[in-house]
């Protein structure tokens, strides 16, 4: 079968290639990818090439398909998996395979397996690990976003707290505690926020701090503080760039106690140091954002580590249980991953979008892999409608949903735009 995909040939070398997929083996599955959301980790992979720990050294000879936040339809199933998977099933998958101790993952390491493609082959190890998941929901994008949501879910589940003299950790964020998300008004921060407000074990205070007022205003629009208060959560949106002393200002919001849980969503020295400075007693700092600099470092208050039991950790990705939780909470309408999406586009836009991701404002960029479409901000749909009525129809649907992408918008898009 012929496929078209964005593939990595080397550092800063992404190409939209057409190629022939081999026939699947008895332990493999052929799938049609419908949607793939672009991850900052994919940008890091693209600029580093073979210097990225998930990229094979022979990528120039065996280019790797980019993208790992994918969803689509199963097309053909190898004999070994026909009892569980059937053609026509919708799927998503957990890409953090960690297979036999390796770092290999779709979107980084595989020649015929990734998300920025029309079709791909899912290898045996994915099914062996239970990482291929049937998706029973309606919208493909919600299944794509289950992966980035699972990263934040995993971060919340990996947090831990202690009791003096007790050598056993209490896993998860502190119930009824005070939680901060620093550099938190970007797409991943908003994903963490929707989860913090609607998970089973919740904090009583959430502070979202950022230096981008436009992002903070959008976040406040999507998450009204009054609605959070009705659920018993005190929610604050704070621009630390306007504070003379951000650490003192954030601590003041907590009544001087500091935070029980702090999530750092930017690999920036000043943000990491601020995260350390606002920890309360037994505060857990999760350095969520992965740097590209292997020598990246920042100062941390080790007096507090010793005397106040503060601690630091980092998580990268979630696990299959986190993915399942994301899909469940989305199906129950408790979380809305669409808060992360600000742009849509076709496969033809994926390479340029990936290589320029830090320069493009807004949140998640959602790629529909069978469409030929430029990358378009949801806020620009109505302007695009001046030349094409279909964009006006999309703008009407999006505006009716608080400016968010939604199942109705995806359904209209896939029905009215030509697919390859």
Indicate where each model-derived feature is located.
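Hydrophobic/small residue at the entry helix of a nucleotide-binding pocket
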Residues: 151, 187-188, 215
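ADP-ribose/adenylate-binding Rossmann-like module
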Residues: 261-268, 277-296
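Adenosine-nucleotide cofactor-binding segment
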Residues: 176-177, 182, 193, 197-271
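C-terminal hydrophobic helical "lid"/dimerization subdomain
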Residues: 163, 221, 244-251, 270-277, ...
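Glycine-rich beta-strand-centered segment in the early N-terminal region that forms part
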Residues: 22-37, 51-100, 113-114
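Glycine-rich Rossmann-fold phosphate-binding loop(s) that bind the pyrophosphate
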Residues: 148, 183-186
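NAD(P)H dinucleotide-binding glycine-rich loop of Rossmann-like/cofactor-binding domains
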Residues: 95-178
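Rossmann-fold NAD(P)-binding glycine/threonine-rich loop
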Residues: 270-273, 289-309
């Amino acid at each position: 079968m012929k496929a078209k995909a964005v593939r990595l040939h080397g550092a800063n070398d992404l190409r939209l290639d057409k190629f022939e997929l081999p026939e699947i083996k008895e332990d493999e599955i052929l799938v049609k990818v419908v949607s793939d959301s672009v991850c900052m980790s994919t940008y890091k992979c693209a600029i580093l090439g073979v210097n990225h720990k998930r990229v094979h050294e022979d990528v120039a000879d065996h280019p790797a398909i980019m993208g790992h936040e994918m969803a689509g339809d199963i097309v053909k199933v190898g004999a070994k998996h026909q009892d569980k998977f059937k053609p026509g099933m919708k799927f998503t998958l957990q890409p953090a395979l960690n297979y036999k101790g390796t770092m290999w993952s779709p979107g980084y390491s595989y020649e015929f397996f990734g998300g920025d493609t029309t079709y791909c082959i899912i290898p045996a190890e994915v099914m062996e690990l239970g990482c291929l998941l049937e998706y029973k929901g309606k919208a493909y994008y919600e299944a794509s976003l289950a992966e980035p949501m699972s990263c934040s879910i995993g971060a919340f589940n990996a947090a831990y707290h202690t009791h003096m003299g007790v050598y056993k950790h209490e896993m998860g964020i502190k119930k009824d505690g005070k939680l901060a998300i620093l550099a938190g008004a970007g797409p991943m921060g908003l994903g963490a926020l929707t989860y913090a407000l609607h998970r089973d074990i919740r904090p009583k205070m959430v502070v979202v701090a950022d230096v981008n007022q436009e992002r903070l205003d959008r976040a406040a629009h999507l998450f009204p503080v009054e609605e959070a208060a009705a659920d018993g959560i005190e929610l604050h949106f704070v621009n630390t760039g306007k504070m003379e002393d951000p650490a003192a200002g954030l601590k003041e919001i907590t009544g001087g106690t500091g935070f029980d849980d702090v999530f750092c969503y930017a690999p920036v020295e000043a943000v990491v140091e601020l995260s350390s400075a606002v920890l309360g007693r037994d505060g857990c700092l999760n350095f969520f954002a992965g740097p590209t600099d292997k020598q990246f470092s920042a100062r941390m208050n080790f007096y507090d580590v010793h005397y106040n039991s503060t601690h630091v950790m980092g998580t990268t990705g979630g696990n299959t249980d986190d993915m399942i939780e994301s899909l469940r909470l989305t199906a129950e309408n408790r979380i809305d991953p669409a808060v992360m999406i600000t742009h849509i586009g076709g496969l033809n836009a994926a390479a340029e979008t990936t290589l320029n991701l830090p320069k493009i404002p807004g949140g998640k960029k959602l790629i529909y892999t069978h469409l030929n479409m430029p990358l378009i901000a949801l806020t620009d749909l109505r302007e695009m409608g001046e030349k094409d009525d279909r964009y006006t129809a999309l703008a009407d649907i999006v505006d009716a949903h608080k400016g968010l992408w939604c199942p109705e918008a995806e359904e209209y898009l896939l029905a009215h735009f030509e697919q390859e």
